[in-house]
Design a protein with these regions (language model features):
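Active-site acidic/histidine proton-transfer and metal-coordination neighborhood
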Residues: 2-50, 138
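Histidine-acidic metal/acid-base catalytic patches
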Residues: 33-52, 58-154
Length: 154
């Protein structure tokens, strides 16, 4: 019945011009690679898409680059968020959310993420997400904007 619910919601959303998009996220029912694989195998790609979040993908022990390639044409939305995997090794529970960083100040290989997005022909939205910035919202947004412009050339 779960597949039927997702496909039914996705079909209804599509009729209304909206894309049903699952965002694998820490602390939710769709987070681990096995959850994503199950959802991909048991839902209709015409109706169920994905939002990949680079940091949450990393928290789940996956490579954002490999997940982008796996999801391929089902990728409808993209969250760019950095994470410090060194701090993540000692973080427990909700403290894992405190390991997020401004773009370029964590350990995610964003040039490789950009290359994977280009490889699958993704031309959708890239949303920079800053959860619990270390210094402050404005500073973290500015640092991330500079990184996107100067390093990723976006």
């Amino acid at each position: 019945y779960k597949r039927q619910i997702a496909d039914t919601l996705g079909a209804y959303a599509k009729e209304k011009g909206v894309t049903l998009c699952f965002h694998p996220h820490y602390g939710t029912c769709v987070f681990w690679e096995s959850d994503i694989d199950y959802l991909m195998a048991h839902t209709d790609p015409r109706y169920v898409s994905f939002c990949i979040d680079t940091a949450h993908t990393t928290l789940a022990g996956m490579s954002p680059v490999e997940l982008i390639k796996k999801v391929g044409p089902r990728l409808a939305y993209m969250h760019l968020k950095d994470v410090d995997t060194y701090a993540l090794k000692t973080a427990e529970g909700a403290d894992k959310m405190g390991t997020f960083r401004a773009l370029g100040h964590g350990t995610i290989d964003f040039p490789a993420v950009k290359a994977a997005l280009e490889e699958i022909g993704y031309d959708g939205i890239l949303c920079v997400e800053l959860d619990r910035p270390e210094v402050g919202n404005f500073h973290s947004a500015e640092v991330s904007r500079i990184y996107i412009r100067d390093v990723l050339d976006i």
